[in-house]
């Protein structure tokens, strides 16, 4: 039986990346870097809202794996996706969180991280 990843898993993954800070967005737990949004637990905690590169990337994720990634009219046209926590794998979750960090982190911080500093 698959165990659904939770916010604790999101925090553990995000702890790998420099500058990530816990915050609150719209009354729910969120993660930011340099004050910029990375992800947040949706009001309904079965989904995570995650920042992606652009709207085309969001659309590709939703079309490629509609059982995992979705949107609502509120998020349509925004560079992000909603992630169904009951079906996303930890590997997918880790990739999404790293990508969100890379989108928002400073280039020099990313370069230092990639260099193993």
Task: Locate predicted features.
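Charge-dense, helix-prone N-terminal extensions
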Residues: 1-117
């Amino acid at each position: 039986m698959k165990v659904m990843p939770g916010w604790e898993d999101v925090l553990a993954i995000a702890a790998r990346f420099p500058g990530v800070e816990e915050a609150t967005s719209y009354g729910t737990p969120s993660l930011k870097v340099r004050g910029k949004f990375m992800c947040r637990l949706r009001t309904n905690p079965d989904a995570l809202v995650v920042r992606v590169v652009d709207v085309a990337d969001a659309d590709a994720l939703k079309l490629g794996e509609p059982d995992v990634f979705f949107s609502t009219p509120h998020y349509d046209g925004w560079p992000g996706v909603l992630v169904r926590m009951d079906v996303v794998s930890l590997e997918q979750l880790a990739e999404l969180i790293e990508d969100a960090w890379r989108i928002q982190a400073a280039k020099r911080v990313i370069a230092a991280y990639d260099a193993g500093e």
